[in-house]
UniProtKB/Swiss-Prot annotation:
Taxonomic lineage: Eukaryota, Metazoa, Chordata, Craniata, Vertebrata
Subunit structure and binding partners: Monomer.
Secretion signal, residue range per the UniProt entry: 1-20
Originating organism: Crotalus viridis viridis (Prairie rattlesnake)
Pfam families: ADAM_CR (PF08516), Disintegrin (PF00200), Pep_M12B_propep (PF01562), Reprolysin (PF01421)
Cofactor note: Binds 1 zinc ion per subunit.
Residue numbers binding Ca(2+) 2: V403, N406, L408, E410, E413, D416
Superkingdom of the source species: Eukaryota
Record-linked PANTHER family: ADAM A DISINTEGRIN AND METALLOPROTEASE DOMAIN, DISINTEGRIN AND METALLOPROTEINASE DOMAIN-CONTAINING PROTEIN 28
Annotated ranges, domain Disintegrin: 401-487
Protein name per its UniProtKB record: Zinc metalloproteinase-disintegrin-like VMP-III
């Protein structure tokens, strides 16, 4: 049984109206002083761990008593978590620190269903909590021989720059379905019940400007990164996504790419470095670069709908604020783009709060995604199947003994539906994480009313003629593995060949880019791909655009004939500086009889597969 530590916070209510104090978050105009005093409930003589698995803090905020419940975030670090920095002469130094007994927690306020908390308990209490809809920050005061802490509202931190700060993503990514109206985006409990968690293994990179900004203090940088990712992890839990930090690299000697204020250039360079360098050294799903330089007119930029892509599963974030919460929200926003989420429109909502995917940072940073964001994220996951986030790190990669009640199915558990108060699974005993008597299953696509679905029940629909439907076996709650027809098998009446469960043909790609009444262009249009200019090429090698050979022209930029009303464009193409790959002919597309596109070449099907 987990021993609970009860810590009483004695609050000297000195609100200091009209005065100010300089804290880590900046200049604060209105704050309260608290003095933490631990009152332990451990038996006399018991060995107290350095950082408990669960704690409660009792404190007063604005004169009212509150109880803060905290649980250690055991999904924060991976088992093979590594840290890399560089010696003055450029040597790579990689270590694997012991992070089992860390001091980073998530939490909530008792009797406040909408409350959240993200707290570091390493040296006092530092972080944020939301109480009755308002965001509070807490941090220890740096006074000798004192346990004093400051508690203050985010709104009372002076903002140095009141100019509107924007995300650099300007073009929406189109999913397979049009965005539904807000009234159609209700996420039901039944939908949530069968949405399995996804796991993003995150790698952070810190540039030289950040090192200079922090006077070369690498430990200070590391601590800040831990606190930021702890908050990102908290934010994504409500999207049924766990974010685990698998690595941190600090460019302590020099930048490994040229970091420029032009965000598009820097993002492209970082993506290329990740693909050619970082991925060869460390397995991960997504990489984010934090920089202390001022990006031109933006505070972040990321590729959209790119999670798991070797180059484009990346984002860049400006270290815009001293408040970790603000930077964490920016990181969650840019990673949201990687997960297929666009900026929110006017009909998107997250209750009475601002939403994370607003194009600009809100006056008070939100920790909530909108209904639109939830739909777009899971639409991307279910339709595009970014496979790298399917693997569950727990048990092998994430340091975490089984914990009943954390909503993760771990070794020795038959089910895990959360705490007894929150469990909505009628098949599962929340107190023991065992199935209730008479239940065969508690989750899975082949589990209905706690029983295995009948043999032959469809559990995964066909997405194309290259992807047959899967059916339940009657012996398991899990749907059988997703099986595709063999790559290269003819499909769509020989207009295409199967490729990873799809039947890619140029007509469909033109439709996805431009809509109805748009078709594959005449062969003469594709000859433009022999130019090797900014749009007409077949592939990139070492950053250089390689012109197509005559036999490969249909494996470069896609050209479409637009017959829609008012249009007469026989060689319409799509090009964007932010995503040069979008608008290229997709891999596996038929380019001639018996031939398909592979790495910018038109090759025999037998050679490709």
């Amino acid at each position: 049984m987990i021993q609970v530590l009860l810590v009483t916070i004695c609050l000297a209510a000195f609100p200091y109206q009209g005065s100010s104090i300089i804290l880590e978050s900046g200049n604060v105009n209105d704050y309260e002083i608290v003095y933490p005093r631990k009152v332990t409930a451990l038996p006399k003589g018991a060995v107290q761990p350095k950082y408990e698995d669960a704690m409660q803090y009792e404190l007063k905020v604005s004169g009212e008593p509150v109880v803060l419940h905290l649980e250690k975030n055991k999904q924060l670090f991976s088992k093979d978590y590594s840290e890399t920095h560089y010696s003055p002469d450029g040597r790579e130094i990689t270590t694997y620190p012991l992070v089992e007994d860390h001091c980073y927690y998530h939490g909530r306020i008792e009797n406040d269903a909408d409350s959240t908390a993200s707290i570091s308990a390493c040296n006092g209490l530092k972080g944020h909590f939301k109480l009755q809809g308002e965001m509070y920050l807490i941090e220890p005061l740096k006074l000798p021989d004192s346990e004093a802490h400051a508690v203050y509202k985010y709104e009372n931190v002076e903002k140095e720059d009141e100019a509107l700060k924007m995300c650099g993503v300007t073009q929406n990514w189109e999913s397979y379905e049009p965005i539904k109206k807000a009234s159609q985006l209700v996420v039901t409990a039944e939908h949530q019940k069968y949405n399995p968690f996804r796991f993003v293994e995150l790698f952070l990179v810190v540039d030289k400007a950040m090192v200079t900004k922090n006077n070369g203090d690498l430990d200070k940088i590391k601590t800040r990164m831990y606190e930021i990712v702890n908050t990102v992890n908290e934010i994504y839990r409500y999207m049924y996504i766990h974010v685990a930090l698998v690595g941190l690299e600090i460019w302590s000697n020099e930048d490994k790419i040229t970091v420029k204020p032009e965000a598009g250039y820097t993002l492209n360079a970082f993506g290329e470095w990740r693909k050619t360098d970082l991925l060869t050294r460390k397995k991960h799903d997504n990489a984010q670069l934090l920089t202390a330089i001022d990006l031109d007119r933006v505070i972040g930029l990321a590729y959209v709908g790119s999670m798991c892509h070797p180059k484009r599963s990346t984002g860049i974030i400006q270290d815009y604020s001293e408040i970790n919460l603000v930077v964490a929200v920016i990181m969650a926003h840019e990673m949201g783009h990687n997960l297929g989420i666009n900026h929110d429109s006017g009909y998107c909502s997250c209750g009475d709060y601002a939403c994370i995917m607003r194009p600009e940072i809100s006056p008070e940073p939100s920790t909530f995604f909108s209904n639109c964001s939830y739909f777009e994220c899971w639409d991307f996951i279910m339709n595009h199947n970014p496979e790298c986030i399917l693997n569950e790190p727990l048990g092998t990669d994430i340091i975490s003994p089984p914990v009943c009640g954390n909503e993760l199915l771990e070794v020795g558990e038959e089910c895990d539906c959360g705490t007894p108060e929150n469990c909505q699974n009628e098949c599962c005993d929340a107190a023991t994480c065992k199935l209730k008597s008479g239940s065969q299953c508690g989750h899975g696509d082949c589990c209905e009313q706690c029983k295995f679905s009948k043999s032959g029940t469809e559990c995964r629909a066909s997405m194309s003629e290259c992807d047959p439907a899967e059916h339940c076996t009657g012996q398991s709650s899990e749907c059988p593995a997703d099986v595709f027809h063999k790559n290269g098998q003819p499909c769509l009446d020989n207009y295409g060949y199967c490729y990873n469960g799809n039947c890619p043909i140029m007509y469909h790609q033109c439709y996805d880019l431009f809509g109805a009444d748009v078709y594959e262009a005449e062969d003469s249009c594709f000859e433009r791909n022999q130019k090797g200019n900014y749009y007409g090429y077949c592939r990139k090698e070492n950053g250089n655009k390689i012109p197509c050979a005559p036999e490969d022209v249909k494996c470069g930029r896609l050209y479409c004939k637009d017959n829609s009303p008012g249009q007469n464009n026989p060689c319409k193409m799509f090009y964007s500086n932010e995503d040069e790959h979008k608008g290229m002919v997709l891999p596996g597309t038929k380019c001639a009889d018996g031939k398909v596109c592979s790495n910018g070449h038109c090759v025999d099907v037998a050679t490709a597969y």
